[in-house]
Amino acid sequence: MDIDAIHKALANPVRREILVWLKEPEAYFSEQEFPLASGVCAGQIDARCGMSQSTVSAHLATLHKAGLVTSKRVGQWIFFKRDEAVIKEFLDQLRNGL
């Protein structure tokens, strides 16, 4: 776990909002045709953000590099999910380390 990469990822409000959406995908992405258990399609995240695809892709890449989300390619689509184990480890370390 790279603490600095996680702090960098969390420093941006859009990336924090994406993590909130991915925490409850049923509430934010109910229109997705694929099962949400697979994650949320990058295109759905693009649409909700209201930003260019390249900007959202860069935000998702930062979250992925920090280990906060996982990605899975299915055909032409990429699905993203929160990595709850990494998030828990980060929160535990933050809580106990400061």
Language model features with spans:
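A common structural junction motif
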Residues: G97-L98
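Short, Lys/Arg-enriched N-terminal segment that forms or immediately precedes the first helix
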Residues: M1-H7
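Residue-level signal for well-ordered alpha-helical positions
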Residues: Q93-L94
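Short, charged/polar, Gly/Pro-enriched secondary-structure boundary elements
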Residues: V86-F90
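Beta-hairpin "wing" of winged helix-turn-helix
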Residues: K65-V74, K81
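Alpha-helical residues within the helix-turn-helix
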Residues: A47, A58, H64-K65
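N-terminal helix-turn-helix DNA-binding core of bacterial DNA-binding proteins
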Residues: K8, V14-S52, I78-A85
